[in-house]
């Protein structure tokens, strides 16, 4: 029997999908990311979405101003695609190094997505330009047709929208974000080097029974929603396979406690404080610790064409207790796994 490792040293990871919000929420949640992760792909779905180079530069400056002293962190900005976005704005931002990627939200698919795209074929000229300049397209992969069951929206998106995009633009780099289904995992595994996917800790650790059986747990509610166990197991198998098409993207999405614990609660899991220990715990359960570094720190940079980080982080087998809540002015934010203990801690 192989002895369990007591320490894990990996290249410093990056988070390829995060919501940092703005103002007081930004300054509250950012340190949990900037302490551990070197870079993060920052989602553009603020209340006023990031659709211009100027707004991206201003948001990046607000993020950098909130990074605590001693943390080395680079926010990678994204452009929010809309029905009327000017292709010139997109290409200028990418060529100037302001935009790392562009984000496609189908209109009304998730938080602050009302400005999203309602007619995806109508923005094919943008995709053509992105393919030409090598700019990645990040996709929230759910259809928004009210007639489609919420648990089926990701699988339907593959057939109706994603496959036609890939057929039309075969060399467009696409990240299928926060995948939640066996359909998506199989689709990415069957793809090529132009298709990647991020996977969150909550979708690896939990399924819809954890959220709904014995009482509703609003702090596990996110979009895309947790699916049945068979889908969870497929995601776990995908990351344990060692395929370089899957990489770390927490989709950490904080909301104030009262906005989660309400009669119509918001979607989003604030997992940044526990993200790396949570991923390590999953990979250990899967006997796949040999693939943890690639998932966290190598596959993402390779897909984006960016250098891997030079420095390392160390995980130690020391119990790590998640706080019950984190102060947010006069309110609070409830973190993922609140009050629970993980086997791994990041060595400070």
UniProtKB/Swiss-Prot annotation:
* Name of protein: Dihydroorotase
What the record says about family reads: Belongs to the metallo-dependent hydrolases superfamily. DHOase family. Class II DHOase subfamily.
Which reaction(s) are listed as its catalytic activity?
(S)-dihydroorotate + H2O = N-carbamoyl-L-aspartate + H(+)
Q: Which GO terms describe its molecular function?
A: dihydroorotase activity; zinc ion binding
Question: Which residues are catalytic?
Answer: 251
Key word NAD present? no
Residues with N6-carboxylysine modification: 103
> Which PROSITE patterns does this UniProt record tie to the protein?
DIHYDROOROTASE_2
Gene Ontology CC: one annotated term: cytosol
Give the binding site residues for Zn(2+) 1. Answer: 17, 19, 103, 251
Q: Specify whether Hydrolase is a keyword of the entry.
A: yes
Pathway entry: Pyrimidine metabolism; UMP biosynthesis via de novo pathway; (S)-dihydroorotate from bicarbonate: step 3/3
Q: What NCBIfam families does the entry give?
A: pyrC_dimer (TIGR00856)
Q: Which PANTHER family match?
A: DIHYDROOROTASE
Q: What does this protein do?
A: Catalyzes the reversible cyclization of carbamoyl aspartate to dihydroorotate.
Q: Which BP terms in the Gene Ontology apply to this protein?
A: 'de novo' pyrimidine nucleobase biosynthetic process; 'de novo' UMP biosynthetic process; pyrimidine nucleotide biosynthetic process
Mind listing the UniProt keywords for this protein, alphabetically?
Hydrolase, Metal-binding, Pyrimidine biosynthesis, Zinc
Relate the assembly described in the record: Homodimer.
- Name any cofactors this protein relies on: Zn(2+)
């Amino acid at each position: 029997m192989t002895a369990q490792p007591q320490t894990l040293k990996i290249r410093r990871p990056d988070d390829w999908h995060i919501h940092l919000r703005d103002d007081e929420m930004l300054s509250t949640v950012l340190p949990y990311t900037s302490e551990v992760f070197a870079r993060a792909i920052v989602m553009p779905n603020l209340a006023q979405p990031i659709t211009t180079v100027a707004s991206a530069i201003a948001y990046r400056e607000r993020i950098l101003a909130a990074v605590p002293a001693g943390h080395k962190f680079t926010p990678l900005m994204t452009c929010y695609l809309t029905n009327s976005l000017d292709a010139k704005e997109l290409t200028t931002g990418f060529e100037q190094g302001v935009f790392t990627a562009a984000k496609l939200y189908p209109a009304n698919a998730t938080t602050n997505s009302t400005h999203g795209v309602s007619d995806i074929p109508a923005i094919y000229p943008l995709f053509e330009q992105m393919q030409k300049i090598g700019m990645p397209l990040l996709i929230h992969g759910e259809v928004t047709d009210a007639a489609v069951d919420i648990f089926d929206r990701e699988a339907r998106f593959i057939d109706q929208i994603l496959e036609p995009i890939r057929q039309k633009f075969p060399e467009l780099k696409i990240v299928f974000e926060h995948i939640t289904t066996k359909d998506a995992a199989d689709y990415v595994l069957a793809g090529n080097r132009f298709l990647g996917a991020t996977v969150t800790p909550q979708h690896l650790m939990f399924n819809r029974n954890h959220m709904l059986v014995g009482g509703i747990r609003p702090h596990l509610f996110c979009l895309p929603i947790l699916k049945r166990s068979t889908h969870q197991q497929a995601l776990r198998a995908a990351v344990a396979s060692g395929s370089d098409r899957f990489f770390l993207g927490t989709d950490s999405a904080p909301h104030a406690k009262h906005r989660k614990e309400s009669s119509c609660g918001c979607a989003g899991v604030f997992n940044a404080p526990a993200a790396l220990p949570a991923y390590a715990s999953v990979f250990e359960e899967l006997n796949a610790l040999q693939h943890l570094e690639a998932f966290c720190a190598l596959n993402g940079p390779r897909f984006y064409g960016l250098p891997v980080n030079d420095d390392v982080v160390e995980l130690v087998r020391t119990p790590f207790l998640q706080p019950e809540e984190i102060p947010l002015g006069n309110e609070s934010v409830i973190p993922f796994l609140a009050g629970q203990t993980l086997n791994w801690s990041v060595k400070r």
